[in-house]
């Protein structure tokens, strides 16, 4: 009977140690994401936050704050990626990313980012039209202005 109780106690200790290790890894990923933001490396930041979010969900209640922080960061970082695509004149990719941003922002209850993403869409198409007009690509300009 004592061996059985010791075995159960050892199992609980191992589980709690594994959970603490997972929490440390998730926190490290989150911190790496924050560092990537400061360097304006949006893609790396998004990757880190998404991984930290997934790890946090598996950890449970101990990671509620981490999960909330990730859900707060992910929509804004995704919006920055879309803005970079617009700056690089990758309008079709940016349009898809902005749709994704709006969905993610609504899912994570970030109305401000969702609104910004929706407001950016017509501005982006207008910019596409202006850029095409400068190149005398009238068909593409008309397409951009029509959207």
Where are these regions (language model features)?
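TPR-repeat structural position
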Residues: 42, 91-92, 138
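Alpha-helical junction/boundary sensor with strong preference for TPR arrays
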Residues: 56, 105-108
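N-terminal leader/linker segments that initiate helical-solenoid repeat arrays
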Residues: 2, 18-83, 87-88
